[in-house]
UniProtKB/Swiss-Prot annotation:
This is Type VI secretion system spike protein VgrG2b. Part of the H2 type VI secretion system (H2-T6SS) specialized secretion system, which delivers several virulence factors in both prokaryotic and eukaryotic cells during infection. Forms the spike at the tip of the elongating tube probably formed by haemolysin co-regulated protein 2b/Hcp2b. Allows the delivery of the Tle3 antibacterial toxin to target cells where it exerts its toxicity. Additionally, acts directly as an effector and promotes internalization by interacting with the host gamma-tubulin ring complex. PANTHER family: PTHR32305, TYPE VI SECRETION SYSTEM SPIKE PROTEIN VGRG3. Changing residue 939 to A: Abolishes bacterial periplasmic toxicity. Belongs to the VgrG protein family. Its cofactor is Zn(2+). PROSITE patterns: ZINC_PROTEASE. Gene3D superfamilies: 2.30.110.50, 4.10.220.110, Baseplate protein-like domains (3.55.50.10), Gp5 N-terminal domain (2.40.50.230). The active site is at 936. Disruption phenotype: Deletion leads to a 75% loss of internalization of P.aeruginosa into host cell. It comes from Pseudomonas aeruginosa (strain ATCC 15692 / DSM 22644 / CIP 104116 / JCM 14847 / LMG 12228 / 1C / PRS 101 / PAO1). Residues 268-291 are annotated as: Disordered.
């Protein structure tokens, strides 16, 4: 339309440089920088480009002498053209400051900032100060957001569109303001009343109108579904799906499913999905118009009037507008054929005002391959990680990072194995170079996939000199020592070693050498387990130490045929000689203990995979076998102790030699029996003493008994009498008298006979004291130090006598008074009655403490409600069998004596001990801690199904105190959940949950289907 009341002007800077506008085209749209192309004229033919380029300028559309529209911006392009009679032509492009962001690109990281915060920082960096944010919804912080080489403008638009933000511009004479908002419906409406529609031909209307209106509807995506994955909640698919609006005129089954959804928190999933759907349906209902009302501005709604179709006379919002205008100079300045006058028209795309229009989402930049980075952390630290083993890194491209713990977010590290509380773990250490890849090529999802050596991190051994060595070598934390697993593949000299610098401890296997880097001097073949510190070898089911040959592991690892044969032969010899001695008045031989030990060695490997068809195994015995002999030597002392018997058998000779003393003590009998040879007891230098301190000594021989003293005398003394007998004759010395009796002759031969008065000679007889035989036993824990007080015990004496009691505060039994030493067996025992008593007391105390709570119920407002994630986690196990709205999580003790790491759930609420408090969402915790949550939710389930968890739990804890673990269970055929106590039920449900999440539902069902067949609807 040509209008004499229209005028276009343009000035640069502070109005010091003005141009005549010949033509202009302004293209502006929601979520796009505007572009104003101007064709200008000036009577100046040598304008300094410095005065124009990159300077602010203002275009004004005047109507009826008043400014109807301003467009303010920055000059991006300036061209000087041809000159006419008095004027020179120029061309110019005016854009917003936002367009300058397209000129800059960067590699950088934003951490823990929301998108509105990132956009604000980005614009401030470019000095876009006329900026207004209108935020009506929550925008969650992004833990990690990377600008991966894309332009600042692309980053701005990508983040804004992902978060459902739209932007447009508002103008005045001196500035243009960028307006950004997450709601479009509440934005500006144009001033000056409704926009008129007129179907009259262009140019026939006395006032600005829209003279063309075309309305269209397009079939577009009807539903948007998205999923994403978070390792913190691996069982939750984070699926969100939304249906579009105004689907009356199209099918509703057109679904777009996108993965990944590019969100890591469920709270961001819905708005992300909503924004994406709105972007796909941005032109589902659209109108195309043309006219000459300059008030149409993208983002500013207007009311339409005058259209013959009533429902089109509604509120509309322009999303794109193209303005064109011409303003030609007078004939005296141009050619005679130059057009005259002013014209202006526009074309626009509209959407209904109530449509929350969004642009199509922009793709994230893809990183096509892995990158190199360096692990970083706090100053003075060597290892810096979180509970997931994640680390922080410094990328070479990051100019803003400071090589510290703030350089990046926590980044996950790929490990060789990663199971539920099992797997491989090697945390990259500060200063190490790592390879960082990106999940789905997403720059915001880095993951460490490998490590590499470099100039500052050299391999453990110099290469290629020691290329035959393979090793896993660690470094002492804040130290210089190491642990190492080394494999040496040197030809004909292969070996392996597991080593620790602490105590120079190592297990060497194969061809043993000194370290290769130090020359590799041979030091043996086979294996060596050594340490400069202490060592121990333990085997709970038995241990075989043998030098019997077994080439290439050709038999079972407990092959003990030779040692069993030797033990059987020794047992047979001991039994034969012992029985013979017993039959000939020797001390009886008890072969049963030796036989028991021999059988234990015989059965040592029973139950193992190569002896599975036999018994379940013998006792945990140690068997030593050396075909060439066993030597034990020490320059100090050697002690051999046995709680029962020591049996020493030699098929030939047993020789005991001591440089000084040989001392043999026995609490009962000592028997020496030589079956076929001599028994000699000789003291070469000192005296020989043979005593029977409380009984008799008998010297008996089938032939002769000889008593002699080579140098001095033989003295025979007795307190009562001495009698010598032979062949019926006798001599008795008694009471100071001598009595001779004989059946035959009495012959006295002497050179002289002397008969004098009475005389006597007294000899001092030895005195024999009774030894101390009373004893008291002390019961101690396995550590040998901690006493066991108040433990019931039973002592069984060798004669069958039984003594019962309870240990005192020091763990001691009562004093046992016996006349002689006895063998005794001590047993600890549990009694049911104390457990029942304590259980009753515990239940009574628990009931007394909580009687008010039992009567009135727990405070329904205390603590916090379950989160959405916690409910979802619990529903995966309990379904809808729990009223989740009544469950409260309380960071407080239920009873004063609740332990710091204990959790109680006695009344439908869960009470956390001090060390377990402060968890915002248990569904985001580790799998094992989620298992704890499921265990406690089982008590909530029990409570809601009628179980008095408080009283039953008190009884159970009493049994736990006295009788041991009440949590351990064994799944048995035919038993369901009701056949187990409440703590076992909690552990069963927890283990079902863990197995389901670790190995899959099929595995969990195969193990727990029987016990949980009525669960969760009942027991």
């Amino acid at each position: 339309m040509r209008q004499r009341d229209l005028k276009f002007t343009f000035v640069v800077g502070e109005g010091k440089l003005a141009f005549d506008v010949v033509e202009f085209e302004l293209e502006e749209a929601l979520c796009e920088p505007f572009r104003l192309n101007l064709k200008l004229a000036s009577d100046k033919n040598a304008i300094d480009f410095k005065q124009v380029l990159d300077q602010p300028g203002t275009f004004t559309l005047w109507q009826d002498g008043r400014p109807a529209r301003y467009v303010h911006g920055i000059v991006s392009h300036f061209t000087q053209g041809s000159s006419g009679f008095r004027r020179t032509r120029y061309e110019l492009l005016l854009e917003p400051q936002l367009a300058r962001l397209e000129l800059c690109c960067n590699w950088r990281i934003f951490q823990e900032k929301s998108v509105p915060e990132i956009l604000q920082a980005l614009l401030k960096e470019h000095r876009v100060l006329d900026y207004e944010q209108r935020i009506y919804h929550e925008h969650l912080p992004r833990e990690y957001c990377v600008q991966a080489g894309d332009s600042d403008h692309y980053l701005h638009d990508r983040l804004a569109f992902e978060e459902g933000l739209v932007y447009y511009f508002r103008f005045d004479e001196h500035r243009h303001t960028l307006v950004c908002s997450d709601r479009l419906y509440v934005q500006e409406r144009i001033a000056g009343g409704p926009v008129l529609f007129s179907a009259q031909p262009e140019g026939d209307n006395p006032q600005p109108v829209l003279h063309s209106f075309r309305y269209s509807e397009n079939v577009r995506t009807a539903r948007q579904t998205q999923r994403d994955y978070s390792f913190k909640r691996p069982t939750y698919d984070q699926e969100h799906h939304l249906a579009g609006e105004a689907l009356e005129h199209q099918g509703s089954s057109y679904e777009r499913y996108d993965y990944p959804g590019r969100y890591k928190r469920s709270g961001a999933g819905r708005p992300f999905t909503e924004s994406r759907l709105r972007g796909h349906r941005r032109d589902a209902r659209v109108a195309s118009v043309s006219g000459d009302d300059p008030r149409l501005i993208p983002g500013h709604a207007f009311a339409l009037e005058g259209h013959p179709r009533a429902d089109f006379n509604a509120w509309w919002r322009p999303v794109r507008v193209v303005h064109r205008g011409t303003q030609y100079a007078g004939q005296e300045e141009e050619s005679a054929d130059a057009p005259l006058g002013v014209s202006y028209d526009l074309r626009a795309e509209l959407v209904p005002e109530d449509v929350e229009w969004r642009p199509a989402p922009l793709p994230r930049p893809r990183i096509d391959g892995p990158q190199i980075a360096t692990v970083v952390g706090p100053a003075g630290e060597e290892i810096h990680c979180d509970e997931w083993g994640r680390v922080k890194v410094q990328f070479p491209w990051d100019r803003e990072g400071r090589h510290d713990e703030f350089s990046t977010c926590w980044i996950r590290v790929a490990q060789n194995w990663a199971g539920a509380d099992w797997g491989h773990m090697a945390i990259p250490r500060i200063g190490q170079e790592v390879i960082v890849d990106y999940l789905d090529g997403d720059c915001d999802q880095p993951i460490v996939t490998g490590r590499t050596y470099r100039a500052t991190n050299r391999p453990p051994y110099a290469l290629p000199d020691h290329k035959i060595l393979s090793t896993i070598k660690s470094k002492e934390y804040k130290g210089s020592r190491a642990n190492e697993l080394r494999i040496d593949d040197t030809t004909a000299q292969i070996s392996a070693a597991l080593m620790s610098d602490h105590g120079a401890s190592a297990l060497h296997l194969g061809y043993l050498t000194h370290p290769r880097p130090e020359g590799g001097k041979p030091r043996g073949e086979g294996f060596e387990l050594r340490t400069d510190e202490h060592g121990a070898v333990r085997a709970a089911k038995g241990l075989l130490l043998s030098t019997e040959e077994q080439l290439r592991a050709g038999a079972g690892h407990l092959d003990r045929g030779v040692v069993v044969q030797v033990l059987e032969a020794a047992l047979e010899l001991a039994r034969e000689l012992g029985d013979y001695a017993g039959e000939h008045q020797g001390v009886g031989h008890d072969a049963a203990p030796q036989q028991t030990l021999q059988e234990a060695v015989r059965d040592l490997g029973h139950g193992a995979n190569d002896e599975s068809g036999k018994s379940n195994g013998g006792k945990p015995a140690i068997a030593l076998s050396g075909p060439a002999g066993i030597a034990a030597a020490t320059p100090a002392s050697l002690t051999l102790a046995a709680g029962e018997h020591v049996d020493s058998v030699a098929r030939q000779n047993q020789q005991v030699t001591a440089g000084q003393k040989v001392v043999i003590n026995a609490g009962s009998d000592i028997g020496l029996f030589a079956q076929g040879g001599e028994l000699r007891q000789i003291t070469h230098q000192g005296p020989m003493l043979l005593q029977a301190q409380k009984n008799d000594i008998r010297l008996e021989a089938k032939q002769s008994v000889e008593v002699s003293a080579s140098q001095q005398h033989v003295l025979v003394t007795a307190k009562e009498h001495i009698t010598l007998m032979c062949g019926g004759a006798y001599l008795t010395l008694k009471g100071g008298n001598i009595e001779l009796g004989m059946p035959g002759n009495f012959v006295v031969k002497a050179a002289k006979h002397s008969h004098v008065g009475a005389a006597s000679l007294e000899a001092e007889l030895p005195q024999f004291e009774v030894g101390e035989t009373q004893r008291r036993f002390v019961l101690k824990q396995l550590d040998g130090q901690t006493a066991m007080p108040n433990v019931p015990y039973t002592i069984t004496m060798a004669n069958g006598e039984v003594i019962e009691g309870v240990t005192d505060a020091e763990g001691a039994t009562q004093l046992l008074q016996k006349d002689a030493m006895n063998i005794a067996k001590v047993d600890m025992k549990h009694t049911k009655s104390p457990a029942s008593a304590v259980a009753g007391i515990a239940a009574a105390v628990g009931a007394a403490v909580a009687v008010g709570k039992l009567l009135g119920g727990p405070d329904a407002e205390a603590g916090r409600a379950l989160s959405e994630g916690e409910i979802s986690l619990a529903k995966g196990v309990f379904g809808d069998s729990i009223d989740y709205s009544t469950v409260r999580l309380r960071d407080e003790d239920y009873v004063p004596w609740q332990g710091k790491d204990y959790v109680m759930a006695p009344n439908g609420h869960i009470y956390f001990g001090e060390e377990l408090r402060g968890v915002a969402d248990w569904s985001l915790e580790s799998l094992q801690r989620q298992g704890l949550f499921i265990h406690e939710m089982t008590h909530v389930w029990q409570h809601q199904h009628g179980v008095n968890v408080l009283l039953v739990g008190a009884y159970q804890q009493a049994r736990q105190f006295l009788l041991g673990d009440q949590y351990a269970y064994r799944l048995e055929p035919g038993k369901t959940l009701k056949d187990y106590n409440i703590e076992q039920q909690g552990d069963i449900v927890r283990d079902y949950f863990l197995e389901k999440n670790e190995f899959g539902e099929a595995s969990a069902n195969s193990r727990f289907a029987g016990v949980l067949k009525n669960f969760p609807t009942g027991y």
